[in-house]
Amino acid sequence: MGVFKIKADQLAWIGSAADDPNDLCLHGHVAVQFGDIVLEDHGTVSATALYLLKTLTEDKVMAYNDIQMIPSCGHFLIANVDLTEVQISGCDTGTDWSTIHEGDHIRFVLPSGHEELVTLRDYRYEVLDFAKSVKRFYDACTPKEVRADEFERNGYIAFWNEWQRRYNEGLMLLSLETGREMELSHDGLHYFVSHKGVDVEWSLYCEESKELQIYPGQKIFYEKAHLGDKLLRDEIANINFEAIL
C-alpha cells in the first residue's frame, strides 16, 4: 500500500507575523509525501486544511479554474446561503493534485502523472492531524477581528462551520472504524464519547460532573445527547472533538 503524509511548519500570518487579529488566513510551509515523491510549497495552510477535510468525503480533481490544494493565497471566502459551506478563491498559482475516492481507498494523481493509492483510514488520520495543528495555531492567537462587511463576515463564519462539521464527522468515522474512544471539550468541560458497534449503543460521559448518558444508535445520540443544557445537534458547530484515545 502507498504512503501519504502531510505536515505544515513555519506557520505565520501575513508579513510573517506571529499574531495578527486582522489576518483571517494562516500561511506556512507545507510538505506532502506521495510514496517516494515529496512536494513542498509555501501557501495558505488554512485553505489547504479545509480542502483536505472536504476530500474526506468528496473527490477533488485538478482544474485550471479551481483552487489548488496548497494555494499561494486565498483572497475570498465565499459562503453558501445557510453558511454551512464555503468556497475559497485565490491566486492561479500553488501546488495541486487530484484526490479520488475508490471504495475504502484514496487515489492521488500528481501533475507529473504519478499515482499513489492509500487506505481511506490512513488518509483520515493524516488529514485530521493536519487540520488539528492548524486549528491549534488559530486558538493560540488573538481572536480575529472580522470586519463589518457582510460578505467577509459570512465567509469566515461559514469557513469554521464547515471546518468543524467535517472535522467532527471525520473523527467520528475514524472512531467507528477503530473502535476507539473520542475526547471532546465544550464550555470548559471534558467529555468522552464511546460506542459499541455502528448503531448499537453510544455513550457520553462528563469527567467533571460524572454524568453518563447512553443512547441506542448514532442518530439518537446526535438528536438527544445534551452538553450542559443544550442538545448536541444544536451545538455541533461549536463542539471541539479533540482526539481519538
Language model features with spans:
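Short, exposed beta-strand/loop patches in secreted or surface proteins that constitute
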Residues: 23, 31, 79, 96-101, ...
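Negatively charged, low-complexity tracts enriched in Asp/Glu with abundant Ser/Thr
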Residues: 38-77, 165-185
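Acidic, aromatic-enriched beta-alpha/helix-loop junctions
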Residues: 41-69, 197-234
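Short polybasic amphipathic segments
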Residues: 27-35, 88, 98, 106-109, ...
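Short strand-coil-strand connectors
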Residues: 33-35, 82, 89-94, 185-189
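Mixed-charge, glycine-accented linear interaction segment located at domain edges/termini
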Residues: 102-167
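N-terminal "first-domain core" detector
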Residues: 1-49
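An exposed acidic His-Trp-rich patch
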Residues: 66-119
